[in-house]
Amino acid sequence: TFQELAKKLNIWLIPGSFYHHQEGKMTNVAPVISNTGELITLCTKTYPFLPYEEGITGGDESCVFEVPDVGIFGLHICYDLWFPESSRALAMKGAEIILHPSLTDTCDRKEEKIMARATAVQQQCFYIDVNAGGKQGCGQSIIIGPEGEILTEAESIEETLLIEVDLDRVKRVRARGIKGLGQPLKSFRDNPNPFRENKVNKEYLDTLGKLEIPQK
């Protein structure tokens, strides 16, 4: 099983997503498995790809989990990328890396990669966009830094990408702004006409400090 594999290899594992029957409804979920083989959580896709996923029920909770001594991760699935509030909810809960497993071979992969970069910039975090390659999908997985730069990118074939990330950089970018300028999370928090979500999940945003010009 995936849990046995994660324990054997001493890795945290998210083996993509699959359909899952829960509480009388069919959902699309991605399991998060720790390096001890424990099932940490099941992330439910919020936005089914309608009308193609007709009959699939979307989830109503954002998925954030902490890997001890590493950092805070957010997870959303495939079509969730197309809805900015999905990634914003993850960032507001402190996600420093957002993981995005998908399986698509559609002609809009170019646009998805644009949105992935925009998401990294808007949420000031690392964004790991993983798409199935080979016979199942068109691949082109991409890893993006918290200022929108492409760190590494796969081809259309099945491929393994390895990268080391500095999560302290997320903290610096969120504190000082992208290139020392835009501070969207703090601006979102301090807006006098906030969205409802700003009131619901304000605790993490308050840890970012005052919205001010960074000192040299």
Q: What is the predicted role of each segment?
A:
Residues T1-I14, L81-L161:
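CN hydrolase (nitrilase-like) catalytic-core segments centered on the catalytic cysteine
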Residues E4, H20-E96, T106-I114, A118, ...:
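Active-site catalytic loop in hydrolytic enzyme cores
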Residues K7, N35-E38, K45, V121, ...:
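Generic secondary-structure signature for well-ordered alpha-helical cores
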Residues K8, G59, K93, I213-K216:
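Eukaryotic scaffold repeat domains enriched in small/polar residues
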Residues N10, F18-H21:
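Glycine-rich, aromatic-flanked loop segments that form ligand/cofactor-binding clefts
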Residues I14-P15, T41:
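A structural signal for short, well-ordered beta-strand segments and their strand-loop junctions
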Residues V64, F126, A132-K216:
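C-terminal beta-strand edge segments of enzyme domains
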